[in-house]
Amino acid sequence: YKAKLKSLRALPQALKEVLERIPADSHPMDVMRTGVSMLGNLETEQSFEQQQDVADRILATLPAIICYWYRYSHDGVRIEENTDDDSIGAQFLHLLRGEKPNELHEQVMNVSLILYAEHEFNASTFTARVCASTLSDMHSCITGAIGSLRGPLHGGANEAAMEMIENWTSPEEAEREMLGKLERKEKIMGFGHAIYKDNDPRNGIIKIWSERLAQEVGDTVLYPVSVRCEEVMWREKKLFCNADFFHA
């Protein structure tokens, strides 16, 4: 199966030309949405029996879609989308950075992708199923799902959490600001869950990898700040981190 996905990574030239026209300040989710939609125009699904192959093709091309746009719009580089990496996570990092990732980075990326893929019913998968219920094609279903995932209350939660964490330079400042947010009844992203009531089992896994990344780069701010935020929210509101927080 890995060999099959590797054989499906190449992007059509017409899709590359579209990606080159997307502005550099576009949101990556918008780029993926447009990329999948354009792929559907170029490789139109002809029958229901093709849907597994179409799904594999989309899965194989998404890393190249986002990285081709990013490297061209930011660096002026037209990347070669095929690499010798076996995993999707490794290929994505390789294309993004222009060099093969180390083992830790590959592991973290793959763990992250697995944790999100193995999650339960959510807004984006619901959107995809609504599209599928009308017998729409796979590209339309995935395009709709990406549009749903684009929202700040869904896929944007980890982005919002990171924006918050990056503002603080110490655990003490983080605690002070978190208490202020709670007093003002501001929404704090990355905590609580609609289904999980006691804890999010994904958080226990990604938190370990987050700490390993922090240790690798000698981080003395982001991870300690994140841990303090987790402690404050549990102490004050009995709210636990969901998967998005330490993914950030």
PLM segments and residue spans:
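Hydrophobic alpha-helical bundle cores within soluble ligand-binding/oligomerization subdomains
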Residues: 1-248
